Curated annotation (Swiss-Prot):
Belongs to the zinc-containing alcohol dehydrogenase family. Keywords: Acetylation, Cytoplasm, Lipid metabolism, Metal-binding, NAD, Oxidoreductase, Phosphoprotein, Zinc. Homodimer or heterodimer of closely related subunits. NAD(+) binds at G200, L201, G202, G203, V204, G205, D224, K229, V293, G294, V295, R370. Gene3D superfamilies: Medium-chain alcohol dehydrogenases, catalytic domain, NAD(P)-binding Rossmann-like Domain. The modification Phosphoserine is found at S23. This is All-trans-retinol dehydrogenase [NAD(+)] ADH1B. GO terms for biological process: retinoic acid metabolic process; retinoid metabolic process; retinol metabolic process. The modification Phosphotyrosine is found at Y35. The modification N-acetylserine is found at S2.
Amino acid sequence: MSTAGKVIKCKAAVLWEVKKPFSIEDVEVAPPKAYEVRIKMVAVGICRTDDHVVSGNLVTPLPAILGHEAAGIVESVGEGVTTVKPGDKVIPLFTPQCGKCRVCKNPESNYCLKNDLGNPRGTLQDGTRRFTCRGKPIHHFLGTSTFSQYTVVDENAVAKIDAASPLEKVCLIGCGFSTGYGSAVNVAKVTPGSTCAVFGLGGVGLSAVMGCKAAGAARIIAVDINKDKFAKAKELGATECINPQDYKKPIQEVLKEMTDGGVDFSFEVIGRLDTMMASLLCCHEACGTSVIVGVPPASQNLSINPMLLLTGRTWKGAVYGGFKSKEGIPKLVADFMAKKFSLDALITHVLPFEKINEGFDLLHSGKSIRTVLTF
């Protein structure tokens, strides 16, 4: 019996307020409007960005259904949708690609102006919501809201992928892998023979390590205070691993001494102001490039001496690894299917969706790299 055009009742993890656990609720998911797509979720990863909302470090309207790193199957489409159809395997895109705005038309940029990250409204692009719980409208998150058995997204925020794709693996390409890997190959444009430093060895940081290796870096120095992550980092391409707590001097000074004045490329993949500054300072003052990948805390600012940049450093930011999402994500999935890279090492835990709070506990304890929830 077709559910197209009907309200679907299903389970979703609702965050009612910050610093509280998710609540598994019965929700109603409205049919997609014109140029929208309703997706049956199959697998979703737990990303640190979702946790930033829980902790209050990333502000978005609540109550909300979070989640943005996922893969699923199209259940139905609204009027006018042409790029996907019911039955297609897809990845929702937390940064859309409308193809019409100034950013989308610029070949060097990917931060589509239809995004809901910079100033989140908690709605779809038409300003309305598709979720209801206990008679109350529930906000969306980043236009994806994948912590739900069904979700609705805009057509420009979903990408059709290879029909043979294992969704419980390629869901990581929806955020973590693409963000980290792309920050190295697209944003920093790591060069063969170069020296790199990666701050933070979670799923995104390890993906940045993989990107540095793929780009031909000669030295990849992984930096984290959790030594348990070092073996995995070396498995994925790190040549050295260091713990800032093992040194009396600032970690940027340690790195500069190790690399004859500083690394060529550095990546902050944590989302802390102190490590953002350390990442900048550890790259060479005349030719180094530092990339901010981690989502920074809300309402906090960095203050720097302009001389740090005047001498020749470059300081950049990266969203979605610089990939134009609707074009780039299917290509990454195709590369995965062609065995150009593996995602297995990043997935440390697989849990049923109902155990979402256990998944976040694993994240907080530092025991997981990526936990994938299956529906």
